[in-house]
C-alpha cells in the first residue's frame, strides 16, 4: 500500500547528512550528524554530544533513536529552502473541483446531492 509522505517526514529525510538535535520525551538531548531516518522517525546519528536530564554531557560514536520516543527535532535553517516548500507555495487557490477529503466540495459545486433533491426548507412534490 503506497502512501504519500507529509512535509515533516520529507524534511526529516532531507536532513540526512546534516547536524541535527533530537530531544527525547524523557528530556535527554542528542546532537549529531544524521546518518539515516525512517518514516516513523527512527533515526541513526553519529558523532553525538549527549546531554542527560541532569545536564551531564558525554560523547557517543553512534546511536539509534526510536521514533516514538522523540519529542522534537531541530534541523538546520538551510533546509527551509528545500524544494518541497516551493511546491506548496506555488499551488495557490487554483485547485480543481472535488480535490480534497470526501465528496462534499464536489457535490456542493455541482449543485447535486443524494436522493431526489429537496431537504430542509424545500417544497415537497405534490402526489396525485
Curated annotation (Swiss-Prot):
Gene transcribed to yield this protein: SMD3A
Organism, scientific name: Arabidopsis thaliana (Mouse-ear cress)
Function as written in the Swiss-Prot or TrEMBL entry: Core component of the spliceosomal U1, U2, U4 and U5 small nuclear ribonucleoproteins (snRNPs), the building blocks of the spliceosome. May play a minor role in the splicing of cellular pre-mRNAs.
InterPro entries to which the protein is assigned, alphabetical: LSm4/Sm_D1/D3, LSM_dom_sf, Sm, Sm_dom_euk/arc, SmD3
Disulfide topology: none
Tissue expression as described in the entry: Expressed in young seedlings, roots, leaves, flowers and immature siliques.
Entry GO terms, CC: cytosol; nuclear body; nucleolus; nucleus; spliceosomal complex
Record keywords, A-Z: Cytoplasm, mRNA processing, mRNA splicing, Nucleus, Ribonucleoprotein, RNA-binding, Spliceosome
Chain intervals with Gly residues compositional bias: 112-121
Subcellular location(s) per record: Cytoplasm, Cytosol; Nucleus
Ranges that cross the membrane: none
Protein name, as recorded: Small nuclear ribonucleoprotein SmD3a
CDD domains (alphabetical): Sm_D3
UniProt GO molecular function: RNA binding
Pfam family of the protein (one): LSM
SMART domains: Sm
Effect of disrupting the coding gene: No visible phenotype under normal growth conditions, but the double mutants smd3-a and smd3-b display embryonic lethality.
Stretches the record annotates as Disordered: 90-128
GO biological process: one example: spliceosomal snRNP assembly
